[in-house]
């Protein structure tokens, strides 16, 4: 049976990149500004069989995915699992930590979402084939209204948070699915810049 686990890695404190992007978006979005923005590295591990405990133990000690002095790592195995992104979100009014609904923008370098060195190491440690993919997740909450609308494909927020020339981007409204990174061909729904998943 195929198993997929997501690892989301975010800053424990204020993420300066998210804070800067949040204030840039406040200028771009005019009357509908975001209230909070968070960013996390996304890693997806896929394998066959029972290796979950060994994988988590290796990742915690490897220091390749998260720096324990700076980062918070959250494991997910289904869409119902928390992402913990809102707890680390930069707030427009200053500070960190948000609550309530939001929307996600998931980005990945087109043609380069694999992580071959990390994947080879995971295969050696687990003693089985492992598929490893990487991307980035942004979580945005609106000051008022619909966060998903702020992240609309082709909108100012999507263009600021993802480079349309080199990254695929998809908006996710609702729960973040597991798995999320896939083999969509260029131009498929959810695989091209500005794609969407609900």
Per-range role (PLM):
Residues 1-198:
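Core nucleic-acid recognition elements
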């Amino acid at each position: 049976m195929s198993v997929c686990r997501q690892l989301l890695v975010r800053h424990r404190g204020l993420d300066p990149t998210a804070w800067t992007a949040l204030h840039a978006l406040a200028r771009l979005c005019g009357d509908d500004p975001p209230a909070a923005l968070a960013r996390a590295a996304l890693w997806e591990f896929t394998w066959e069989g029972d290796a979950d405990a060994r994988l988590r133990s290796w990742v915690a000690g490897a220091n390749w995915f998260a720096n324990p002095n700076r980062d918070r790592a959250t494991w997910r195995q289904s869409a119902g699992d928390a992402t913990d992104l809102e707890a680390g979100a930069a707030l427009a009014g200053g500070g960190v930590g948000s609550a309530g609904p939001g929307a996600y923008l998931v980005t990945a370098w087109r043609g380069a979402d694999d992580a071959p060195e990390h994947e080879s190491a995971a295969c050696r440690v687990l003693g089985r084939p492992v598929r490893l993919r990487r991307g980035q997740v942004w979580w945005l909450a609106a000051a008022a209204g619909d966060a998903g609308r702020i992240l609309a494909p082709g909108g100012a927020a999507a263009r600021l948070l993802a480079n349309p020339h080199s990254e695929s981007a998809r908006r996710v409204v609702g729960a973040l699915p597991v798995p999320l990174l896939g083999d969509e061909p260029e131009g498929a729904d959810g695989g091209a810049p500005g794609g969407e998943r609900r």
